[in-house]
């Protein structure tokens, strides 16, 4: 709400709120927005609809078609609420549409990091840390301090004490998210509650594994737990394709499970 509602109201911009993803594209044609604020699911939906057509002429005209889908006037697209999958991000980037991705929580009012359009950006990250926000990674968890951190939950001291901790004369908010910081950029690895321990003693995050698999597997897949020889179900159109995916995933997942 801070980004899409309050910011635009302060600057007296015209604001339209979509009534649902089913009518999102039709609404874009009618409203012709200059800026879009969306969740990743909307961008995934647009990508899937275009790829479903799978016609050479459409692929040739993709940059123009994408702009038309969003009403024809879109200059900026902001994505938030969840991590944008790398294949989706790359799809739009390849077609001259840059997605600005940010990260934050309601408890931090809300921004913690953002990938700006103009400044140096790292598209694999969830953005560069804001100047007035302090972020530390404690036991793998993203923790935040600064003037944007809430005072607490209304009339719920127990819940407040569970997420706010005092350290170095500052109040830190425990996000419950796993991440790391490199060169001032924040990288999201998933929810800490999605971490589980393998039989070899190593920890792995389900969301991070899903992200790697989804880069190379277009069909639905399931990660359903740890077994002696297998813990995921992936469908492919041929044995050759399966063997190709297995080789790629073995290399990629070894970088994630460490």
Which stretches of residues belong to each language-model region?
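Gly/Ser/Thr-rich phosphate-binding loop
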Residues: 7, 11, 34-38, 46-121, ...
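Conserved ATP-binding loop and adjacent catalytic segment of the adenylate-forming AMP-binding
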Residues: 15-18, 86-139, 148-152, 161-165, ...
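Short hydrophobic/charged patches on amphipathic alpha-helices used for structural packing
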Residues: 25, 63-66, 210
């Amino acid at each position: 709400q801070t980004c899409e509602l309050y910011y635009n109201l302060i600057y007296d911009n015209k604001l339209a709120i979509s009534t649902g993803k089913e009518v999102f594209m039709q609404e874009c044609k009618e409203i012709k927005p200059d800026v879009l604020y969306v969740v990743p699911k909307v961008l995934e939906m647009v990508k899937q609809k275009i790829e479903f057509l799978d016609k050479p002429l459409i692929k040739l005209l993709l940059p123009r078609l994408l702009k038309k889908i969003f009403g024809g006037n879109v200059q900026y697209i902001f994505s938030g609420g969840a991590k944008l999958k790398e294949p989706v991000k790359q799809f739009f980037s390849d077609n001259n549409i840059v997605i600005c991705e940010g990260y934050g929580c309601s408890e931090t009012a809300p921004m913690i990091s953002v990938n700006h359009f103009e400044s140096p950006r790292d598209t694999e990250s969830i953005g560069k840390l804001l100047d007035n926000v302090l972020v530390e990674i404690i036991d793998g968890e993203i923790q935040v301090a600064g003037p944007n951190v809430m005072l607490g939950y209304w009339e719920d001291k127990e819940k407040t004490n569970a997420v706010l901790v005092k350290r170095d004369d500052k109040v830190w908010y425990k996000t419950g998210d796993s991440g790391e910081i490199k060169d001032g950029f924040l990288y999201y690895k998933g929810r800490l509650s999605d971490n589980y321990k393998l039989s070899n003693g190593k920890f792995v995050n389900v969301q991070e594994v899903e992200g790697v698999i989804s880069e190379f597997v277009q069909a639905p897949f399931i990660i359903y737990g740890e077994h002696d020889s297998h813990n995921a179900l992936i469908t492919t159109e041929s044995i050759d394709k399966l063997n190709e995916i297995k080789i790629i995933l073995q290399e990629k997942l070894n970088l994630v499970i460490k």
